[in-house]
Amino acid sequence: KEGYIVNYHDGCKYACVKLGDNDYCLRECKLRYGKGAGGYCYAFGCWCTHLYEQAVVWPLPKKRCN
């Protein structure tokens, strides 16, 4: 599974500026989803890869980004 890492409080994606390989996105994806996850900046949001099927990613049901 893949997807944008999401802030549970506001429903927004984790933003990033440096597209492609991005240490911030990689670190945040690993913190949220475990050591096996990958991450990079895609379309100014942190995109996480190699996730488990039940991983919660953006968009959150019934929670819109404010």
Curated annotation (Swiss-Prot):
Family: Belongs to the long (4 C-C) scorpion toxin superfamily. Sodium channel inhibitor family. Beta subfamily.
One MF term in the entry's GO annotations: sodium channel inhibitor activity
InterPro entries on file: LCN-type_CS_alpha_beta_dom, Scorpion_toxin-like, Scorpion_toxin-like_sf, Scorpion_toxinL
Keyword Amino-acid biosynthesis: no
Origin species: Centruroides ornatus
Gene Ontology CC terms: extracellular region
Name of the protein this chain belongs to: Beta-mammal toxin Co2
Domain LCN-type CS-alpha/beta: 1-66
Function (record text): Beta toxins bind voltage-independently at site-4 of sodium channels (Nav) and shift the voltage of activation toward more negative potentials thereby affecting sodium channel activation and promoting spontaneous and repetitive firing. This toxin acts on human Nav1.1/SCN1A, Nav1.2/SCN2A, Nav1.4/SCN4A and Nav1.6/SCN8A voltage-gated sodium channels. Also, it reduces the peak of sodium currents in Nav1.5/SCN5A at all potentials. In vivo, is lethal to mice when intraperitoneally injected at a dose of 5ug. No activity is observed when injected into crickets or woodlice.
Domain of life: Eukaryota
GO annotation terms (biological process): defense response; envenomation resulting in negative regulation of voltage-gated sodium channel activity in another organism
This protein's record includes keyword DNA repair: no
